[in-house]
């Protein structure tokens, strides 16, 4: 079939458009399909059609459902929540998952992604931009047409897990920078960063762990028994990759605990250094006070005849000593 040439086709080619459709064949060729031509886009053998919906209108969704006769049970699944789930009906199945990404350094956000697939056609749906889906819109991959809908969904979900691996890499870099700071002179400022990284790792685990139900169900032999061993192999590999991602998230939480132990040890070492200095100062001043007390300081020094001026001068000197000691302590990170 030919791609549409009207205004809708122009919208379909944009990487930021709400509607995007591409038809792949086994020869490694692909073509963009407009929304108006979607009804005529009925994939045959060794072809695969993919529709990507980014924050579409209800009219766009209804048009896709009507053109491809997608199961009605999957329609309310699109905006039905954020909890990862999977379902199927006859020739189609659908899955909801959460992509890691976005937010700021204090909080990582997730984007809900829904895939509806079957009969050599795949629909992906999200309300926000997802980087790897935007890349897939412009890429011209090889013989994607030979893949079934199940294998294409496995590819999408594998990229979804890649977003968690990327987030874990960023977390590990933050841990390394923090530990370098702790071993340097920034230990006093590390506690807030430790708290942030702990919350960040816990949030990432809460986002990833519920996917166990999805990947566990998809890896069972009875999930898509009519699609052959290839789909089973892809889903099993996907479940193994999920378990690896979950282990790495758990390890990220342990890394925060290890950094906290390093922080505690460094704090204890600095406290010991400060106590050694304070002990030395106490011994010296105590010895001086003992000598002064023994002599009674009964000398006819002019200071004792200076009256109020001498008194206030001594007070000013004591205040200056206190401020100097405070400045020294802050500079040495004693408190």
Name every feature range the model reports, one short phrase each.
Residues 1-220, 226-228, 237, 241-251, ...:
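Peripheral, non-transmembrane regulatory/ligand-interaction domains of membrane transport proteins
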Residues 69, 240-335:
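Hydrophobic alpha-helical transmembrane segments and their immediately adjacent juxtamembrane loops
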């Amino acid at each position: 079939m030919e791609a549409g040439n009207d205004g809708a086709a122009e919208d379909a080619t944009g990487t930021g458009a709400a509607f995007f459709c591409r038809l792949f064949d086994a020869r490694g060729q692909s073509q963009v399909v407009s929304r108006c031509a979607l009804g005529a886009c009925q994939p045959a053998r060794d072809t695969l059609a993919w529709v990507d919906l980014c924050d579409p209108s209800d009219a766009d969704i209804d048009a896709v459902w009507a053109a491809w006769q997608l199961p009605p049970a999957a329609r309310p699944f699109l905006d039905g929540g954020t909890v990862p789930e999977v379902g199927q009906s006859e020739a189609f199945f659908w899955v909801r998952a959460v992509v890691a990404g976005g937010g700021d350094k204090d909080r990582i956000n997730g984007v809900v992604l829904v895939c509806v697939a079957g009969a050599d056609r795949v629909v992906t749906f999200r309300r926000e931009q997802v980087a790897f889906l935007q890349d897939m819109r412009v890429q011209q991959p090889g013989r994607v047409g030979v893949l079934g809908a199940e294998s294409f969904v496995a590819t999408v979900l594998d990229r979804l897990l890649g977003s968690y691996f990327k987030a874990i890499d960023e977390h590990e870099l933050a841990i390394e920078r923090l530990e370098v700071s702790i071993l340097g002179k920034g230990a006093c400022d590390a506690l807030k960063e430790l708290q942030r990284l702990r919350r960040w790792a816990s949030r990432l685990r809460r986002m990833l762990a519920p996917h166990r139900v999805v990947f566990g169900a998809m890896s069972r032999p009875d999930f898509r028994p009519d699609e052959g061993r290839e789909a089973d192999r892809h889903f099993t590999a996907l479940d193994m990759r999920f378990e690896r991602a979950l282990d790495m998230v758990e390890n990220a939480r342990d890394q925060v605990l290890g950094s906290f132990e390093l922080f505690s040890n460094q704090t204890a070492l600095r406290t010991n250094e400060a106590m050694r200095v304070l002990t030395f100062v106490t011994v010296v001043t105590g010895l001086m006070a003992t000598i002064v007390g023994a002599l009674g300081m009964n000398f006819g020094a002019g200071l004792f005849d200076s009256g109020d001026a001498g008194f206030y001068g001594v007070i000013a000197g004591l205040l200056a000593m206190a401020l100097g000691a405070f400045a020294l302590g802050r500079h040495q990170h004693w408190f």
